[in-house]
């Protein structure tokens, strides 16, 4: 299957012009209506900074392959005039529903495909894809951290397992749900020493916040969570 390079190249053209990349990509992301979703979640602003701008900036950081620290320190591409703490505070907000945000992106993307005549034909074969991958980390005090088996390296590494659920519409693979998992191991200690477990980060959570559910899922099996994902988004099969 050949990708439509002429359309993908539009993004690369934006990336090649540093002085206008930020404005052009913010306009492109504006089609996804992130501000309306954040408004419904009561997350419009924090410390006087637009939540939608922070989230879109985080997306741009991934596109250019730079860290928050480096972007803010060197003002690369003039993507943001905010300090790095604004981004860190956004990422750890207990009320932030990252799953809902990701699903919003996916559904809005499908709507845009239909709007511009790029939606797959009705007889196209579609499917769900559920797969896991390793997110290797170095911080042993991170909450929920454990030693997980990396099939690529053939050994256990410190980190998390990322479970990702995506929808393949015959042309595009669209991720729309995810969860992070730890592995208890044979000894039930996550592969950590007693001292490391004691020093790991812990916090009390409000059971009504999305971060509470994320942490509960971290301790569940991937199969259980995958079944929950299928139950939540099974209606997408008919789209």
Give residue spans per PLM region.
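Conserved, well-structured functional cores that handle cations and Mg-NTP chemistry
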Residues: 1-239
């Amino acid at each position: 299957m050949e990708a439509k390079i002429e359309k993908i190249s539009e993004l690369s053209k934006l990336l090649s012009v540093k002085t206008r990349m930020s404005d052009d990509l913010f306009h492109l992301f504006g089609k996804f209506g992130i501000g309306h979703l954040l408004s419904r979640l009561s997350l419009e602003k924090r410390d006087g900074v637009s939540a939608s701008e922070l989230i879109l900036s985080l997306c741009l950081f991934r596109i250019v392959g730079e860290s928050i620290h480096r972007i803010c320190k060197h003002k690369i591409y003039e993507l943001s005039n905010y300090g790095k703490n604004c981004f860190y505070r956004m990422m750890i907000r207990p009320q932030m529903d990252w799953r809902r945000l990701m699903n919003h992106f996916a559904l809005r993307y499908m709507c845009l495909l239909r709007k511009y005549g790029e939606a797959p034909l009705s007889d196209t074969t579609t499917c769900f894809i559920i797969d896991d991958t390793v997110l290797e980390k170095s911080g042993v005090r991170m909450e929920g951290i454990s030693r997980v088996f990396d099939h690529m390296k053939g050994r256990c590494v410190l980190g998390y397992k990322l479970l990702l659920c995506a929808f393949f519409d015959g042309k595009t693979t669209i991720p729309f749900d995810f969860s992070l998992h730890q592995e208890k191991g044979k000894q039930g200690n996550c592969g950590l020493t007693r001292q490391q477990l004691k020093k790991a980060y812990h916090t009390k959570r409000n059971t009504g916040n999305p971060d509470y559910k994320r942490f509960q899922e971290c301790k569940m099996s991937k199969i259980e969570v995958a079944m929950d994902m299928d139950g939540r988004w099974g209606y997408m099969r008919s789209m």
